[in-house]
Amino acid sequence: EAAKGAALLWLESPTNPALENVDLKTIIAGAKKLGVGVAVDNTLATPLLQNPLALGADISIHSVTKYLSGHSDLILGSLTTNDQALYGRLEQSRRYGGAIAGPFEAWIALRGLRTFAIRMQRSQENAMELANRLSKDSRISKVRYPGLATDSYHSLAKSFMKGFGAMISFDVNASVEQVDLMCNSSRLITNATSLGGVESIWERRRRWATESTLVPENLIRFSVGIENVDDLWADIEHAFTAAKIK
């Protein structure tokens, strides 16, 4: 119903930062029946774990800044399509608008792509282990990670994804001030806004006025990197202690 009369349906799965998965196949099929184009932001899933075009989407969107490049040193995005006519219109719009990557930016992206698979594998393994540990910790009230069998979106994620990714979000049983202090007290994990790099990054999302009020005040979004998983856990414990969260 909501898509009637629309020109484009823009989806994101998993969502950021709640890590909710949607039934892409069913939604895309419904949009197609209405003649509505579909674009899917696939940044968190990455092309390794999910293929929106194979599910019928017209456009797959990626922030190349994130996992594809993977070193937090590039600003670049990509649109991918199987439709040659649509590609022609997108390419023309890009050319006329001047949004063309420079050779250095293209080289940085290519460099990152060469290690993309191994980086994603390690980050995902770390995320699975940390999500399991966090889910058993009394200082945490909720962990969102589709790889957990207890996660509300586990079955749906399994049906569309080849893996569960390297993003976790969790709610801390503490005040906003304590959660901010926790994020500021980590020594290995960086308190910053970006994600998808080799380094682990976290932040309290509601510190930004533009973040949705549906996001809990005490939610931490955690982009898990490729560091030693026990070093990461030790840093989390250090941050808990520094913020006096028990």
Regions found by a protein language model. Give the residues of each.
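Positively charged, small/polar-rich N-terminal and surface patches that mediate targeting and assembly
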Residues: 99, 142, 196-198, 203-205
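Short amphipathic alpha-helices in soluble, non-transmembrane regions
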Residues: 90, 180-187, 235-240
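A common structural junction motif
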Residues: 97-98, 185-196, 239-246
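Conserved small-domain helix->loop->beta segment predominantly found in fold-type I
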Residues: 128-187, 206-214
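Short, well-ordered beta-strand elements within core beta-sheets of diverse protein domains
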Residues: 109-118, 165-173, 220-225
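PLP-dependent enzyme catalytic core of the Aspartate aminotransferase-like
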Residues: 119, 200-246
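Conserved PLP-enzyme active-site core in the AAT-like
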Residues: 1-139
